[in-house]
Design a protein with these regions (language model features):
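Asp-box/WD-like beta-propeller blade repeats and closely related beta-sheet repeat scaffolds
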Residues: 2-70
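Loop/turn-rich, solvent-exposed surfaces of beta-rich toroidal or solenoidal domains
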Residues: 169-202, 210-232
Length: 274
């Protein structure tokens, strides 16, 4: 329909609010988070807010300056979280819907060189799941809003790797099953997918298995609408591989031949209603 500017370098992640009124973008190269209005006809409107992350991580590692990799609203639509792998922080911004503005109100300070990459929330809005790229783990938080302030209480940290693994591994993506009782995490470098069961009452994860994905550098994974299959976007090998999930045995069984695609990054699988 049209193009809109974010007044910076290209974004690596975008999301929208539940009302489809605003777009939230994350800038890896410039460490910038941006809010853009969505017009009534669905076209991209004007930029309403922008923030630049500042600071340094460990200068001994490659992630030593701001790199935002995820920007999305909390389920109550009151705050925007911005995951920054460069400075090992998740910055939390209050979101003013009337004006589309974001204001920093809190920071989750993660472990040094953990590289918090992406955060998802449970459908009931009670729990947040944060993957840390360089630590190859998932941090689980209880989330609530108390006196109009965000509260994140960490209740678990669990590895995404198996007993034997590639020491160059980096946790890349996480996805829920449609009923949110299962969580899948891809490990780039290790070239595997970790499969967790999720207790919907406590929010805690139990690791069932970590299995190879028959490709190189799985940057993203997709869960099919039937919750019985997943697809892995293997960036370096230029393939998409497909698997049938055996939940009882905790296994992934390759399903069909890989599809050749040049450096796949992300895909969305949707069920078409007849």
């Amino acid at each position: 329909m049209n193009l809109g500017t974010i007044n910076g370098m290209r974004a690596c992640h975008i999301s929208v609010d539940k009302q489809d009124e605003y777009i939230f973008t994350a800038g890896y190269h410039d460490g910038k988070a941006t809010v853009v209005k969505i017009n009534g006809d669905g076209s991209v409107g004007k930029m309403t807010s922008e923030v630049m992350h500042k600071g340094m991580g460990s200068i001994a590692e490659r992630n030593f300056r701001p790199h935002i990799t995820c920007a999305r609203l909390t389920p109550d639509q009151k705050f925007m979280v911005a995951c920054d792998v460069g400075i090992d922080q998740v910055k939390i911004y209050k979101f003013d819907r009337n004006y589309g503005r974001i204001t920093l109100v809190d920071i989750l300070r993660c472990e040094l060189n953990s590289a918090p990459r992406s955060m998802l929330f449970s459908p009931d809005g009670k729990y947040a799941y944060l993957i840390c790229q360089l630590m190859n783990c998932v941090n689980v938080y209880k989330y609530s809003c108390v006196n109009d302030e965000p509260v994140f209480e960490q209740i678990q940290q669990i590895s995404t790797l198996g007993k034997s693994y590639n020491d160059k591994s980096a946790a890349a993506a996480l996805r829920f099953s449609s009923d949110s009782t299962k969580l899948f995490v891809s490990n780039a470098g290790d070239n595997s997918v970790a499969f967790f069961e999720r207790d919907v009452e406590t929010g805690l994860l139990t690791k069932r298995s970590v299995l190879p994905i028959s490709g190189d550098y799985p940057k993203q994974i997709c869960v099919f609408p039937d919750d019985q299959h997943i697809a892995s976007m293997n960036h370096e090998s230029g393939t998409i591989t497909f698997f049938k999930i055996d939940y009882e045995k905790g296994l992934l069984v390759m399903n069909g031949a890989p599809i050749k695609v040049e450096t796949p990054n992300v895909a969305v699988i949707a069920k078409i209603e007849s």
